[in-house]
Amino acid sequence: MGGRYRWLIIVGAVVALQWVAAPAAAQWIVSPEGQQRQFDRVRLSATYWKGGLEGRIDLGDIEGLPVILDVRDMLGITASEGGYIFEANLGAGRRHRFLFLYGDRKHSGFNVVDIDVTVGGAPIHAEVPIASNIDLRQARFSYNFLFVARPEVEIGLIGGVGWFETIASVDTSLGAATGELRTPYPSFGGNLLINPAGRLRLYAEICGFPEVNVEEFSGWLADFQVRGEFFIIDNLGVLAGYRWYQMDFRLEESDPAFDLKWNGFFFGAQARF
């Protein structure tokens, strides 16, 4: 009797498993693209970013004189030497993802500034060459919750922490000055992924935080990107888009203040698994 019941249980389990699994298996065979894309576990991308830089850098007083540099007019920086951005998107189930970003972008410029001063009642005109360098490094780790997770569209909220380092150096015949700013920051925002057709995808993301004033820290940050992705084969593709990044920070009254805006186009490659 026990053996008979054992076989009945086994047969019943097999029938139940087929009844549950068969529709899912059939759906996977009929539409593998939608099923697989909804559950991408890993997305990796590497992009090259080039564009302009605008803004001001307040280095404070140097030898009793305030030094405020306009990065375009005074420093002669109108375009970047280029930079790179690495991004990783790791899935943990249908609605939970973890995002990691690291980027480095360098700018350099050269300009000749006309200076008119009066010494002993006599006007003196001088031309001062200025060589400058600005380096931005950024890292960010975030949690992404998708409150809409469908094969054709994903919409989510992003929350995390980031870190950036900005170094500005100016070298002239009258002297040199360097300003550095390193700080962690909170990051909040959202993202949107649309799959309009086949291997083509559209992605938009905005992160940052509004104006805050906490103890000796004040500032705000915004990081926005929009891009298109096309997968040549199922797991490898290319992408191109536009990124806009602006920050305004000061840690202490004696530290340099940065009001900078990066923008420009980027292109690169992406893999998904």
Task: Please report, for each region that a protein language model flagged, where it lies by residue.
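Cleavable N-terminal export/targeting peptides
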Residues: 1-38
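Hydrophobic, lipid-facing positions within transmembrane beta-strands of outer-membrane proteins
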Residues: 42, 82-86, 137-141, 155, ...
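Residues on the lipid-exposed face of transmembrane beta-strands in outer-membrane beta-barrel proteins
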Residues: 46, 86-92, 141-145, 159-163, ...
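Short glycine/proline- and aromatic-enriched beta-strand/turn motifs that initiate or cap beta-hairpins
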Residues: 26-105, 264-273
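Repeated loop/turn-to-beta-strand initiation elements of outer-membrane beta-barrel proteins
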Residues: 95-98, 151-153, 198-202, 234-238
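Detector for outer-membrane/organellar transmembrane beta-barrel domains
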Residues: 154-156, 163-164, 175-211
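Short, loop-centered acidic/histidine patches that primarily coordinate divalent metals
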Residues: 207, 231-233, 241-245
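Extracellular/periplasm-exposed beta-strand and loop segments of Gram-negative cell-envelope proteins
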Residues: 54-82, 104-137, 163-183, 211-217, ...
